[in-house]
């Protein structure tokens, strides 16, 4: 289970470009079966590619949260909207709630009830709904004889149309991004939730212990986590704070 969480935590950074080798760097979940799955099996992964990424069934991609359109990531741990992220990812929000009387950086914070949870105005949490290869909808309309300016204009125009078609009548947002040095294009559809509340966090001395001097070193003696909760409307769709 631990190995699966680590794999998916890396995959969650889907918006980052791929390295030259398929087994390095950040991986696109859509391409796991095509580029990474055989090697993942050799390393002990017992999940199927469909269990990692699926647009028709629940998969591990549905447990991954992306904060503020890519600032950080996290993972769901309950059907009540609870998820974990790193302490440093939420630190600025913890600080925004800190006062002389209630020093949450010094003492930490834990909500005893849901109504004690703290609102974070500018914090969003998004989920990947699906990815789609749209290369064949874009590249046939550009060629090497075009100026860079014209090529960009055509790609942007087609991308806008693709995004509009993918999101019309939904609460989703979307974008088209180039990969492999512009040789492939992918539509990424997300659902963004705007009501994300602080549930619990350890004191700064524990959550930030070692700071950057210990970063990427193992073992680490730090509780680098914060617990947050996503709130939705009655229909389960994104809703403003209420």
Q: What name fits each language-model region?
A:
Residues 1-23:
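Bacterial Sec-dependent N-terminal signal peptides
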Residues 17-242:
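Terminal presequence/propeptide segments associated with secretion/organelle targeting
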């Amino acid at each position: 289970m631990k190995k699966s969480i680590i794999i998916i935590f890396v995959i969650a950074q889907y918006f980052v470009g791929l390295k030259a080798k398929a087994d390095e760097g950040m991986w696109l979940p859509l391409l796991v079966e095509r580029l990474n799955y055989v090697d993942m099996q050799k390393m002990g992964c017992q999940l199927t590619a469909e269990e990692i990424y699926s647009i028709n069934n629940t998969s591990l991609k549905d447990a991954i949260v992306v904060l503020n359109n890519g600032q950080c990531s996290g993972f769901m741990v309950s059907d009540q909207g609870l998820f974990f992220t790193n302490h440093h990812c939420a630190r600025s929000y913890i600080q925004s709630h800190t006062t002389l009387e209630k020093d949450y950086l010094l003492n930490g914070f834990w909500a005893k009830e849901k109504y004690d949870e703290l609102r974070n105005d500018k914090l969003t949490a998004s989920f990947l709904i699906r990815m789609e290869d749209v290369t064949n909808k874009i590249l046939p309309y550009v060629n090497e004889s075009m100026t860079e300016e014209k090529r960009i204009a055509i790609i942007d125009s087609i991308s806008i149309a693709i995004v509009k078609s993918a999101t019309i009548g939904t609460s989703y947002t979307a974008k088209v991004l180039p990969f492999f040095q512009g040789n492939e294009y992918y539509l990424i559809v997300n659902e963004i939730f705007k009501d994300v509340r602080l549930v619990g966090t350890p004191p700064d001395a524990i959550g930030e212990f070692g700071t950057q001097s210990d970063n990427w070193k193992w073992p680490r003696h730090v509780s680098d986590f914060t617990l947050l909760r996503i709130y939705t409307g009655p229909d389960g769709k994104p809703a403003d704070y209420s």
